[in-house]
Every structure is written in C-alpha cells, then in structure tokens.
Amino acid sequence: MSLLTEVETYVLSIIPSGPLKAEIAQRLEDVFAGKNTDLEALMEWLKTRPILSPLTKGILGFVFTLTVPSERGLQRRRFVQNALNGNGDPNNMDRAVKLYRKLKREITFHGAKEIALSYSAGALASCMGLIYNRMGAVTTEVVLGLVCATCEQIADSQHRSHRQMVTTTNPLIRHENRMVLASTTAKAMEQMAGSSEQAAEAMEVASQARQMVQAMRVIGTHPSSSAGLKNDLLENLQAYQKRMGVQMQRFK
C-alpha cells in the first residue's frame, strides 16, 4: 500500500458515510494525484461543508495544505487553527510540544505514527496545530504519520460508540437504527439507478421502502417490524445490478 493510499484510508475512516464522504474521497484522490492545485478554492469549499465536525474539517484542511503545492506566504485558515488547538487545554498543548520535539528527530512515516499513537487525540490535534502554523519544521512523511495516528485514535472511539449502538439490547434503538439504514440504502439505490429505463423498477422499490419507513414513523409500529428491511432492499438492488450485468456481492 502506498503512503498516500494509507493516508487516504485513515482520513476517510473518520468521515460519516454519505454523499459528502464520496465527494471528499474524490477530492483527496485528485489532490494526491496532483490534479487539484487551487488550495484557496479547496479550503473555501471545505469550510462550508455541512455535517463535518470542526476537528474533521481541521484535519482535512491540514492534509490539503500539506499536499497541495502553494506559495509559502499563503494565509493560514482560522477554521483549521481553531480546530487544531486542542480545545484550548494547556495540558494538550504541553504534550503536543513534547511530541513535536520527538517528531522533529523522526524521519519515517511509521516511526512517527508509532510515537504519536501513545498520545491522546487532543494532544495530537494540538501538535498538528503547531506544525500547521510553522509548516516545514517536520518532514512530510512524519507529518502524515501524525495525521494517520490522529485519525486512528478518533476512529477507535467512533467504533466503540458504533459497536455500543449495534449491540444494544434496547429494541427501540435497534428498530430506529434499522429504519435509518433502510432509508439510506433506498436513497443510495435511487442515486445508483440513474435515469435509464431499466432503472424504473429499482427506483420504485426504493421509493416504496422510503414511504414505508415514513409511515412506520408516523403511526408507530412494533420494534420487530423493521427486521430484515435493509436486507430486502439490498437483495432487490443486487437483483437489479445482475440484470444490468453488474456483479456486486459485498453490500451485506
């Protein structure tokens, strides 16, 4: 796996699934391939994205600044600086300074990542803030190692939270989660179906599923009534893809 592929993997792991994630993935690919060289426009686009947390925007802005060629004197962006200040916690800043000194002596991506993983996400974000404001004091490989370590810390906590929700025994939460998944699956089906004549059937199935979820929420239904709803939709999607000559077996 190449270094930039690894960085892209870690960065995308902290972004919530949805159309915006697909859009960000495309921007990252373009940046890493050297196709997008307008840093100013890229940062303005990032700043106005909905849904993303300030920290996620800060990390993405940091990665873009690091990888898009730009003039040395380019103004640092306030939304990135604010996100990477460790919540203003002096403890985070103290640890960040210690980590920064260690990273200045490191030269490899994996070495930097190993060192960084022993610090909290707050300290790591603060360290990124230090580097963002004094770009150039640490090698690019080392900085990318720091980025990946930060994303791993964040993804770990997100995974724990997600696992708690998935394994909850509360039937109401499980019911709502199944309906949300069914609704987002239906939306994805509509987007994938496109405008061809053969797509009408898939669009109809997706539309009916969304109407069903809406009705279930309006009238209130038994928590078990949503069981299997998402899988039924995925089976319909796979059947549609098979007729279109596309074989995708990895959705479930």
From Swiss-Prot:
Location in the cell reads: Virion membrane; Host nucleus
| GO terms assigned for molecular function | RNA binding; structural constituent of virion
Q: Tell me which Gene Ontology terms the entry assigns under biological process.
A: viral budding from plasma membrane
**RNP-binding as annotated region, ranges:** 165-252
Keyword Metal-binding among record annotations:
no
Q: How is the protein disposed in the membrane?
A: Peripheral membrane protein
Q: Where is this region: Membrane-binding?
A: 1-164
Query: Cellular component terms, GO, for this chain's entry?
Result: host cell nucleus; membrane; virion membrane
InterPro entries noted in UniProt = Flu_matrix_M1, Flu_matrix_M1_C, Flu_matrix_M1_N, Flu_matrix_M1_N_sub1, Flu_matrix_M1_N_sub2, INFV_M1
The UniProt annotation puts motif Nuclear localization signal at 101-105
Show the SUPFAM superfamilies listed in the entry.
Influenza virus matrix protein M1 (SSF48145)
Q: Which keywords belong to this entry? A: Host nucleus, Membrane, RNA-binding, Viral matrix protein, Virion
The record's similarity note reads: Belongs to the influenza viruses Matrix protein M1 family.
Assembly behavior:
Homodimer and homomultimer. Interacts with NEP. Binds ribonucleocapsid by both interacting with genomic RNA and NP protein. May interact with HA and NA. Cannot bind NP without genomic RNA.
Q: What does this protein do?
A: Plays critical roles in virus replication, from virus entry and uncoating to assembly and budding of the virus particle. M1 binding to ribonucleocapsids (RNPs) in nucleus seems to inhibit viral transcription. Interaction of viral NEP with M1-RNP is thought to promote nuclear export of the complex, which is targeted to the virion assembly site at the apical plasma membrane in polarized epithelial cells. Interactions with NA and HA may bring M1, a non-raft-associated protein, into lipid rafts. Forms a continuous shell on the inner side of the lipid bilayer in virion, where it binds the RNP.
Q: Other remarks?
A: Most abundant protein in virion. When expressed alone can form virus-like particles in transfected cells.
Can you say what this protein is called? Answer: Matrix protein 1
Give the gene symbol: M
